[in-house]
């Protein structure tokens, strides 16, 4: 992590590269066969004592366990990395007790789960699922770094970005342990939350354009203040999301978490605002209801404040329901070990969704 900003391991940063090297050594020390796949995921395989299928090792059954080691700036200490280290501990336990599994076990550090400067989260798992498009791979950040080039730099080949992993039919299950990132388990006194679904996550760029002017000489009734229009939208979104969450009785949230004001001067009426909407829904109906009302909110604000409001879709990941059979196995395992468990929807996105 960055020494002066824990816990910070941005994807492709020197801290990320160092952590990847440490993890690869830890995988190898546990007897795992390590490789980096075409999408830049670090994978350590514990091979089962099975015969190849038609001479092909890739045709064997396998289970994937893992998470991610990258973070947001000043992120959580256990966010992501707990799932990778827990998966590695599973391997240590199997080795120490000489337990052979009837399938290959893959421990995965998925590349770049957190939202990054290229505007897309879950890079590795999206690539594995054939969802990392050429347009996304071709994006360039402010420093001129192309996403595809960074994946290649760390060992990926950037091939097959529009196709699902070739042995997907042989994957029996994907498991990901993760911190809750909330306080429900703590406040209710439960040990484990068994996730029922990962919500759909949708991001939109909102551009509000008015007219910059001198704050001292521009009359209040003759302003096209982009920030005031943006404030109208932000407040309305907050109220709308609260109403939908209550009425639908399902997980639904909407947040404006990033905002830029131009020219951004103390004595200047703001002429332009760029902001990002993050909307998450466990219900397709709730999503549709929100978007319909959101369109009206933007149109009304534009009319009232004499500004132009444009909305651009940035990213989308649909609702991912979890497998009922695996949920039951987790519930049974918790009971056998005397652990209190409840079922809940995940509010956060995860690699397993893809």
PLM feature spans:
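Flexible, glycine/charged-enriched surface loops at secondary-structure junctions
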Residues: 37, 100-101, 161-165, 217, ...
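Short, small-residue-enriched loops and turns at beta-alpha junctions
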Residues: 12-14, 73, 263-264, 285, ...
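An extended, acidic, His-containing surface patch that forms the Zn2+-binding/catalytic region
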Residues: 312-354
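N-terminal capping segment at the start of a domain
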Residues: 1-13, 111
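Short amphipathic alpha-helices in soluble, non-transmembrane regions
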Residues: 290-299
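Midchain, well-structured core segments that form catalytic/ion-binding scaffolds
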Residues: 112-113, 121-285
């Amino acid at each position: 992590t960055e020494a002066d900003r824990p816990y910070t391991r941005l994807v492709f940063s020197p801290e990320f590269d160092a952590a990847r090297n440490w993890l690869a050594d830890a995988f190898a020390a546990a007897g795992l066969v390590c490789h980096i796949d075409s999408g830049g995921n670090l994978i350590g395989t514990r091979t089962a004592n099975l015969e190849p299928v038609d001479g092909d090792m890739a045709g064997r059954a396998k289970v994937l366990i893992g998470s991610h080691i990258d973070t947001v700036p000043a992120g959580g200490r256990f966010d992501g990395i707990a799932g990778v280290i827990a998966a590695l501990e599973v391997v240590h336990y199997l080795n120490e007790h000489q337990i052979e599994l009837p399938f290959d076990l893959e421990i995965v550090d998925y590349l770049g789960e957190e939202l990054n400067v290229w505007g897309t989260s879950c890079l590795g798992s999206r690539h594995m699922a054939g969802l990392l498009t050429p347009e996304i791979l071709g994006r360039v950040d402010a420093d001129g770094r192309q996403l595809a080039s960074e994946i290649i730099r760390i060992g990926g080949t950037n091939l097959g970005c529009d196709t699902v992993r070739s042995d997907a039919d042989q994957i029996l299950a994907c498991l990901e342990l993760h911190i809750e990132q909330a306080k429900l388990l703590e406040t209710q006194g439960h040990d484990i939350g068994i996730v029922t679904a990962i919500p759909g996550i949708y991001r939109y760029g909102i551009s509000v354009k008015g007219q910059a002017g001198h704050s001292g000489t521009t009359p209040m009734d003759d302003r096209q203040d982009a920030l005031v229009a943006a404030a109208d939208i932000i407040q309305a979104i907050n109220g709308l999301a609260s109403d939908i969450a209550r009425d639908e009785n399902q997980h639904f949230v909407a947040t404006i978490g990033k905002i830029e004001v131009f020219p951004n001067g103390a004595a200047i009426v703001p002429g332009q605002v760029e902001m990002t909407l993050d909307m998450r829904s466990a219900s397709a109906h709730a999503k549709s209801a929100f978007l319909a009302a959101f369109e009206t909110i933007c149109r009304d604000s534009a009319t009232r404040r004499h500004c132009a409001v444009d909305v651009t879709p940035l990213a989308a990941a649909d609702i991912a329901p979890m497998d009922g059979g695996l949920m039951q196995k987790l519930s049974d395992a918790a009971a056998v070990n005397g652990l209190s468990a409840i079922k809940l929807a995940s509010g956060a996105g995860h690699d397993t969704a893809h």
